[in-house]
A protein has these predicted regions:
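Hydrophobic transmembrane alpha-helices of secondary-active transporters
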Residues: 38, 109-135, 269-271, 289-311
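Entry/N-cap segments of selected transmembrane alpha helices
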Residues: 134-155, 306-332, 383-387
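Alpha-helical transmembrane segments
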Residues: 192-210, 320-328, 351-354
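Membrane-embedded hairpin module used as a gating/binding unit in multi-pass transport
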Residues: 203-276
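Transmembrane helical segments that form the transport core of multi-pass membrane transport proteins
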Residues: 248-332
Length: 407
């Protein structure tokens, strides 16, 4: 028995050797380091930990398995999905081919590609969301709409930087500050950009308390920030029950492509408000939401293979995503300023920044900044109106872009 030969063979077949022997292996080593950094941000810095930890570990698994000689035993096979999307391939849109050759993370990713996970996340979000503040002040819809400005400005910026229309639309939706919506649209239009777009979307959502306050100070005066708003009216139970039914009917008829997101959002909210499906509401808010989050985050992380992530496009996406988020915040604030004057200075424009759909973080930032300038001010419930309007607004914006570029 040749002991030295056996040891040499084992060493050459190990994953450590593959990083240096395999063509491009060093890139996967970089991706593994990036996964470690993301795990640090999620666990230690608590940047969207429920999503970022899963995304980071999915990234770690896919880069450990695919390029260390595992071949058909890899957890994720990007070439399967390239064939799935290639119209010239005999396996175009063939889930059967994917499933017959899939690794574990490929099976997970089917739920992303089919739009199942983002829709189920919206079901849970709907079950957790109280649309009462929006119903009490319907004008909040305008703030939710104005906060989508960054989506379309970033889209134009992406086109100017050489991205295609579908890619630009996927990048622009980062401005909606809604991770599931960004994942849903990107999977449909530009799946090769899913990793960097998801990372950008969730990172900027976590950085809301740092990004928004300087912009709020820039766009408003001290007098505006001190405005104390009157308590909103009480919303009846009947209004809360009718609302999801009406919104689902109107929005889906207007933009059929929004049906998966808006339909699930309003179904979840109906479970919450109707009073006869408490068990379903509780399941959607807790067990289902947690299970889907695990699959969604891990499968999104699995797409972060080196050849897609380590490129100049990723840097552009990070920059454009920040611009989209900042411009959306400014759009909401400018809408708030307009409403401040239109209402006879009775509306505090700080609630406009909550028009991005990061619920309830953006509303809390409005509350914190408002209290800084007026200790007696309580803007949280007022800010929740545009905040939940932003959830609907981002879904509508995604539906519009999908209708235009989805073919």
């Amino acid at each position: 028995m040749d002991i030295l030969g056996t040891l040499q063979k084992l060493s050459m077949e190990s994953g450590f050797a593959a990083f240096f022997v395999t063509d491009g292996g060093w890139k996967n080593l970089i991706m593994i380091i990036i996964a470690f950094v993301l795990l640090y941000l999620g666990i230690v810095k608590k940047f969207e930990p429920l999503l970022l930890c899963g995304i980071a570990f999915g990234c770690l698994l896919t880069n450990l398995s695919y390029f260390i000689g595992m071949g058909e035993n890899a957890l994720y096979h990007p070439e399967l999905w390239e064939a799935f999307l290639d119209e010239a391939s005999p396996y175009y849109h063939s889930y059967g081919h994917v499933m017959s050759n899939a690794g574990l993370l490929d099976f997970f990713y089917i739920g992303v590609k089919a739009g199942i996970y983002p829709s189920l996340i919206f079901l849970g979000v709907g079950a957790m969301t109280d649309f009462g503040p929006l119903l009490a002040n319907p004008k909040s819809l305008l703030l939710g709409a104005s906060a989508q400005l960054g989506v379309f400005v970033a889209f134009l910026g992406a086109i100017a930087l050489g991205f295609t229309g579908p890619e630009g639309a996927s990048i622009g939706i980062i401005g909606g500050a809604d991770g599931p919506t960004a994942i849903f649209l990107t999977t449909k239009l530009a799946p090769h950009l899913l990793g960097p777009i998801a990372i950008a979307a969730y990172s900027y959502m976590a950085l809301i308390p740092l990004i928004q306050p300087p912009l709020m100070k820039l766009c408003t005066t001290k007098e505006m920030r001190e405005v104390k708003m009157e308590q909103a009216r009480e919303v009846s139970k009947a209004e809360k029950i009718i609302f999801p039914i009406v919104v689902a009917t109107f929005v889906i008829l207007l933009l059929p492509s929004t049906a998966p997101l808006v339909g699930c959002l309003m179904l979840g909210n109906l479970f919450r408000e109707c009073g006869v499906t408490d068990r379903l509401s509780d399941t959607a808010q807790n067990a289902l939401m947690n299970i889907v989050t695990i699959f969604l985050a891990t499968s999104v992380g699995a797409t972060m293979v080196a050849q897609n992530f380590l490129s100049g496009a990723t840097i552009k996406i990070i920059i454009l995503g920040l611009c989209a988020f900042a411009i959306s915040t400014i759009g909401g604030l400018l809408g708030g300023v307009v409403m401040y004057y239109a209402s006879g200075k009775k509306i505090n424009p700080l609630i406009g920044s909550a028009g991005v759909s990061a619920v309830p973080m953006a509303a809390r930032v409005s509350q914190d900044v408002g209290r800084k300038y007026n200790k007696t001010n309580f803007l949280l419930m007022h800010a929740m109106g545009p905040n939940v309007a932003g959830v609907i607004g981002s879904a509508i914006a995604a539906g519009f872009l999908l209708s235009v570029f989805g073919g």
